[in-house]
UniProtKB/Swiss-Prot annotation:
The lineage of its organism: Bacteria, Bacillati, Cyanobacteriota, Cyanophyceae, Synechococcales. Keywords: Amino-acid biosynthesis, Aromatic amino acid biosynthesis, Lyase. Homododecamer. It comes from the Bacteria. This is 3-dehydroquinate dehydratase. Pathway: Metabolic intermediate biosynthesis; chorismate biosynthesis; chorismate from D-erythrose 4-phosphate and phosphoenolpyruvate: step 3/7. Its EC number is 4.2.1.10. One of its GO terms (molecular function) is 3-dehydroquinate dehydratase activity. Pfam families: DHquinase_II (PF01220). Substrate binds at residues 73, 79, 86, 100-101, 110. Belongs to the type-II 3-dehydroquinase family. Catalyzes a trans-dehydration via an enolate intermediate. The active site is at residues 22, 99. GO terms for biological process: amino acid biosynthetic process; aromatic amino acid family biosynthetic process; chorismate biosynthetic process; quinate catabolic process.
């Protein structure tokens, strides 16, 4: 099973940016833990991070035929990007939306997600563990279908 984790804008700063909200682990630390978990779950996990909406869309489109499931933390694009939504729907690859913080306990403008209503699921608010929970969820789903 081949999976892709896409991280959007400013997630390259995790561990440095607002640690009281996003935690102190770096994206590299989180990814290292996820690789271990993916191996335990008999899954392969690739990573992509970009601050550019267009690059994220290109990555999604290029994953057709090689990726079975997507984990996506679109960062601020979660709340603004119909284009990301359309790309995810266009490739018809199952995806799980993931966020480090609970987007529904933050500013009101963060309460709207253009991705969650079509996602397999949404995991948010558990810090770095949100990624692990999302990974376990999508692997469980893909093993059943």
């Amino acid at each position: 099973m081949d999976l892709l984790l896409i991280n959007g804008p400013n997630l390259n700063l995790v561990g440095k940016r607002e640690p009281s909200i996003y935690g102190s682990q770096t994206l590299e630390d989180i990814q290292a833990e996820l690789l271990t978990l993916a191996s335990e779950l008999d899954a392969k996990l690739k990573f992509f991070q970009s601050n550019s909406e267009g690059e994220m869309i290109d990555c999604i489109q290029k994953s057709v035929g090689s990726i079975d499931g997507i984990l996506i933390n679109a960062g601020a694009y979660t709340h603004t990007s119909i284009a990301l939504r359309d790309a995810l729907l266009g490739v018809a690859i199952p995806y799980v939306e993931v966020h480090l913080s609970n987007i529904y306990s933050r500013e009101e403008f963060r309460h709207k997600s253009f991705l969650s209503d079509k996602a397999l699921g949404l995991v948010c608010g558990f810090g770095a563990n949100s990624y692990q929970l999302a990974l376990e969820g999508i692997v469980s789903y893909l093993k059943r279908v």
